[in-house]
Amino acid sequence: MAMGSYLSIITLNVNGLNAPTKRQRLAEWIQKQDPYICCLQETHLKTGDTYRLKVKGWKKIFHANWDQKKAGVTILVSDKLDFKTKAVKRDKEGHYIMIKGSIQEEDITIINIYAPNIGAPQYVRQMLTSMKGEINNNTIIVGDFNTPFTSMVRSTKQKTNKETQTLNDTIDQLDLIDIYRTFHPKTMNFTFFSSAHRTFSNIDNIL
């Protein structure tokens, strides 16, 4: 696969993978979608249980987990992709993982994020700032940011707060681009429904 063509990536908040039937359904879904890379958030797998996640045709599986059944992120790389791993950085509480490698001798960095429910904009901003030396034109950042970037991605049209605006400024300073919003600037699609507030929002992104 040449980087000059395309790289298909899917991302999904799985909300726990401790049930065997759920892991099986996920494996079937990944095989049906057939991407090159799959990023998962909220796996809720403890460090000693990560071996339970298996997908045929996907031997390269990278996890970041906590010692409790909380958070947890995973990056799976398809066997059909000639990916050579160079470095892996894991958050000890399972909120992000970064893998650095190459595809046909072209460097690539993939960061998968699951931001905490409380203080998500500040968390993501601080994480991106701490990693700015690792971020370049071949960096892809994927995940559940737990915060809408703009009022366009809220069903209530609630005004963007100061913390989120500061995060947006950091994203701009790092020359990161919201891929979906770039191609669909006026589309109102949502990835999350809050039953408590009866609102829809888009909190899952690829930069």
PLM features: residue spans?
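A shared catalytic/ligand-binding motif for oxyanion handling
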Residues: 1-207
